[in-house]
Amino acid sequence: VLLAGGVVLLAAVGCHSKTAATPANFVVALNAYFMEHPECLFPQAPRFPYEATDPAEMKPMDALVKEQMLTTEVEPSIHVSRYTPTDAGARAAPRFCYGHRMIASIDSFTPPAQADGFMETQVTYRYTMDEVPVWAESDGMRAAFPAMAVATSGAGMGKVTLASSMAGWTVPD
């Protein structure tokens, strides 16, 4: 009788395993990953003060000036604009992160298959952005940073590989 109860308990625990290929487990894994990997305007951090001569480079920086995240100093003799973070901008500089993804739904996933020594799956998901700062919400910022505009629109979609480990599903490095 005790053995039968143990089997039932083991079966119930197995249904809620962190390693099971379920949308709920994928949501947990992706939210944990994105909490540690925010979305940023500059994936590679620029060095400040940042100097620009090309109008295409200056447009996004000027949007940050308008939002009081940067100041600009123009050197007309050498046609350079020099950008420096303001006190408010210093908190977000140098990458100017604008929040992190929160998974809204798992649309689909491939059957887990062995790859690189782990079970892996491709997950397609929808997300919204969480903790978006006020400076990232203006029309000028959206125009200057189209990828940010899409990410913060509330209708973001993504696709990622997840790998299963003893601790559950994770995004491989």
Which positions does each model-derived feature cover?
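Bacterial N-terminal signal peptides that target proteins for export
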Residues: 1-3
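C-terminal motif of bacterial Sec signal peptides marking the signal peptidase cleavage site
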Residues: 11-14
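Bacterial signal peptide processing site
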Residues: 16-18
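Post-signal peptide N-terminal segment of mature Sec-exported envelope proteins
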Residues: 22-44
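Basic amphipathic alpha-helical segments that dock to polyanions
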Residues: 55-71
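Accessory beta->alpha helical hairpin/"wing" motif in late/C-terminal subdomains of nucleic-acid enzymes
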Residues: 71-101
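Short amphipathic beta-strand and strand-loop transition segments with alternating hydrophobic
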Residues: 99-116
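Short beta-strand edge/turn micro-motifs at domain boundaries
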Residues: 122-136, 140-173
